[in-house]
């Protein structure tokens, strides 16, 4: 399995989910002064913000990270976290990033995810990267 790049707020839900995957990962910094530069293809894992609105659904640090053309060129897919209380906007950050970056929306999960979500993502990522290397 290849690299996971993720953003997690201070609540740490996305961080805990990625830790449970047990894969190589890099975290997008919370602060604007910190910058992450990737050098290899990755799948992005991001929470959804906005409380049910599409406005502000993608966290600002993720936007800053993807506004770097070198980072954006290496994204291969997106996984989103969210809160089902957001209704139709549940995990909508994944839809937005998928459309803007032209990459597949691979999976979505609620809050910090279940053991089933972790297994689904781990297995799905292995299959995804195998297909990527065969293409």
From Swiss-Prot:
Function: Probably involved in ribonucleotide reductase function.
InterPro entries found in the cross-reference section: Flavoprotein-like_sf, RNR_Ib_NrdI_bac, RNR_NrdI
GO MF term list: FMN binding
GO biological process: protein modification process
Family to which this protein belongs: Belongs to the NrdI family.
Gene: nrdI
Gene3D superfamilies (alphabetical): 3.40.50.360
Protein name, entry field: Protein NrdI
Domain of life: Bacteria
Pfam families reported in the protein's UniProt record: Flavodoxin_NdrI (PF07972)
């Amino acid at each position: 399995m290849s690299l996971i790049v993720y953003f997690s707020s201070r609540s740490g839900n996305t961080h805990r989910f990625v830790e449970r995957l047990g894969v190589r990962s890099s975290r997008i910094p919370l602060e604007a002064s910190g910058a992450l530069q990737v050098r290899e293809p990755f799948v992005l894992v991001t929470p959804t913000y906005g409380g049910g609105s599409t406005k502000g659904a993608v966290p600002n640090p993720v936007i800053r990270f993807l506004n770097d053309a070198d980072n954006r060129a290496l994204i291969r897919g997106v996984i989103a976290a969210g809160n089902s209380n957001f209704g139709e906007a549940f995990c909508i950050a994944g839809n937005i990033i998928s459309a803007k970056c032209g990459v597949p929306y691979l999976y979505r999960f609620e809050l910090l995810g279940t053991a089933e979500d972790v297994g689904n993502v781990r297995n799905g990522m292995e299959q995804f990267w195998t297909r990527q290397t065969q293409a």
